[in-house]
Structures are given as structure tokens and as C-alpha cells.
Regions:
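Polytopic transmembrane helical bundles with strong interfacial aromatic enrichment
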Residues: 1-175
Length: 175
């Protein structure tokens, strides 16, 4: 199942790149204060964050792995809270950010939340596969695999709905 962790890295890279690029664009378009200095800081932070994500991946089986993984997860939960608070104008309510962009931040938070949901489903999936490898296949374990698959697929469909909303908001800019 190690190959899944390699595939999962692409999603993590996308999160870092989208978040950093989004802040760069928002600063350069004047949707958030700070202009070019904030844009450069966001780009630099994005590069550091990308390095951290890669370190978390490469060191996951090292003794520091669990701590790095926890820092990585907690930082994503904090980012989700900040994005949601910004979308609700709890942060940056006075910023000249258009409504469509605030909705886009809310949808991006939804994408991230779906990623968390898929991760939880995969944890259950891996646990069941490990039990099957250790002590064999049973009808109950097969049922767990099917149930986990259905749950993860439902979350994945919701994730694509959020992505569709993001694309539509980016093109239409309705509010």
C-alpha cells in the first residue's frame, strides 16, 4: 500500500501550490492588502511549505515521522479554519474581496474537508486490508471493504462538486 502514499503526494503538492498561488494572485489583484510584498512572501512561504510537505513524506517512517505528520495535519486544519473564516468575512471583512472569491474560498475549504474525509476512509480501508493479510478474508471484512469504498466514493463525488463550483465561480464571477 506504499504506492498510495506516493500518489497522495500529488494532492498535497496541489494544496500547497493552489494556496500559495491564490494568495499571490489575491495580493497582486488588490483583493487582500499588502500588494507585491505579500505576494513575494506568499511565494517564499509556499516554497518552504512545499519542502516541508516533501520532508513529511520522505521521513514518514523515521522516528520524527509521526510528529511531522501531526504538524502537517494540524496546519491543514488551521488553514481550513482560516479559509472558512475569510470566506465568511470573519477575517478580512473590510478587504475589497469580491463575493465570488469568498465563495471560492468556502468551496476550497470543502475540497480540503473532502480530502480529510477520504483520508479517514483510507485509514479504515488499510486497517481492514491488514487484517485480511494477517488472518484471512471473511464476509465481514469484505463487507467493510465495500462499505469503505462506497463512503470514500461518495466523498470523492462531493469533492468533484466543490471543484466544479470553484471552476464555475472562477469563470462566471457571479457576485
Amino acid at each position: 500500500m506504499d504506492h498510495v502514499m506516493h500518489v497522495d503526494q500529488h494532492v498535497r503538492y496541489a494544496l500547497v501550490l493552489q494556496t500559495s498561488l491564490g494568495i499571490v494572485l489575491a495580493a497582486n489583484y488588490g483583493f487582500i492588502p499588502g500588494g507585491a510584498p505579500v505576494a513575494f512572501a506568499a511565494a517564499a512561504f509556499g516554497i518552504l511549505w512545499l519542502g516541508f510537505v516533501e520532508a513529511v513524506h520522505r521521513l514518514r517512517k523515521h522516528e520524527a515521522g509521526p510528529l511531522l505528520g501531526k504538524i502537517d495535519r494540524v496546519s491543514r486544519y488551521i488553514l481550513m479554519a482560516v479559509l472558512l473564516a475569510t470566506s465568511l468575512s470573519l477575517i478580512g471583512g473590510a478587504w475589497p474581496m469580491p463575493g465570488w472569491l469568498r465563495w471560492k474560498l468556502a468551496a476550497f475549504t470543502g475540497v480540503m474537508a473532502c480530502g480529510v474525509g477520504i483520508r479517514f476512509a483510507l485509514i479504515a480501508h488499510f486497517r481492514t486490508w491488514a487484517q485480511m493479510a494477517a488472518s484471512g478474508v471473511t464476509p465481514e471484512r469484505n463487507a467493510l471493504i465495500r462499505a469503505t469504498y462506497v463512503q470514500a466514493t461518495a466523498v470523492l463525488v462531493l469533492l468533484w462538486v466543490f471543484i466544479g463550483v470553484i471552476v464555475w465561480l472562477s469563470i462566471a464571477k457571479p457576485v
